[in-house]
Amino acid sequence: MKSFVLFAACMAIVALSSLAHAYPQKLPVPIPPPTNPPVAAFHNSVATNSKGGQDVSVKLAATNLGNKHVQPIAEVFAEGNTKGGNVIRGATVGVQGHGLGASVTKSGNGIAESFRKQAEANLRLGDSASLIGKVSQTDTKIKGIDFKPQLSSSSLALQGDRLGASISRDVNRGVSDTLTKSISANVFRNDNHNLDASVFRSDVRQNNGFNFQKTGGMLDYSHANGHGLNAGLTRFSGIGNQANVGGYSTLFRSNDGLTSLKANAGGSQWLSGPFANQRDYSFGLGLSHNAWRG
């Protein structure tokens, strides 16, 4: 019954998008914006937390500060929960251009500090295909503890117009090593509707000797007006199967397209295994605003 209610809620979010109408402004003399103007983007989101309270995050980013060849990246962010606890604060700086990019992020919550380094490369293979590679490393320092957790990730993806494939590896030093392979395909696409399908397999090796596999698939539908639905099924070897469903919608978008309000809802349920019938639900709102300058 609850799964039906969740699905109905997702459908309701999509239906709400029909209430948002955009009325184009008619200016006697259209004035184009400056070439490649800087933009400050503000993002704010609120989401339910299964452990209680609401997770709140804010981010302020400045992009388009460079030229058509090189773009600096700069942002600050904060995350916390309405029930209290330590607030995570951080900042990211980087640069991207000519298909290459690099950034560093430092964050902390008063108990632990993390420093993340990331680099990526995008190689165009003709008009409709790209080969994308990413590597990152996150070092964490916890106050009063000598052990310093380290998470390393690397991925290689081939993305075409209708098909895609990727392989990635995530190493959590002293904890686990995960290798994931995935394939995606565009099933249907026109001016308004898009339907994608994907399958994946993850081999998880943990240092405590408990190893398992995750295999699954997902269908993802999206509409040009900014709403969509997705559903997936994941099998954990030796544990059980878990179903997921979600939906999102753009509730409001300003006439100039610079401000938008989005909502999302989702949930999961274990279908078998020791966690059978255990459910998790979530709901969130996201507000974003881009302030043009120049």
Curated annotation (Swiss-Prot):
Residues with the Pyrrolidone carboxylic acid modification: 25
Record-listed Arginine amide modification sites: 293
Propeptide residue range(s): 23-24
Keyword entries, A-Z: Amidation, Antibiotic, Antimicrobial, Immunity, Innate immunity, Pyrrolidone carboxylic acid, Repeat, Secreted, Signal
Gene Ontology biological process terms in this record: defense response to bacterium; innate immune response
A GO cellular component entry from the record: extracellular region
Protein function: Sarcotoxin II is an antibacterial protein which plays a role in the inflammatory response of this insect. The main effect of sarcotoxin II on E.coli may be the inhibition of cell wall synthesis, including septum formation.
Protein name (database record): Sarcotoxin II-3
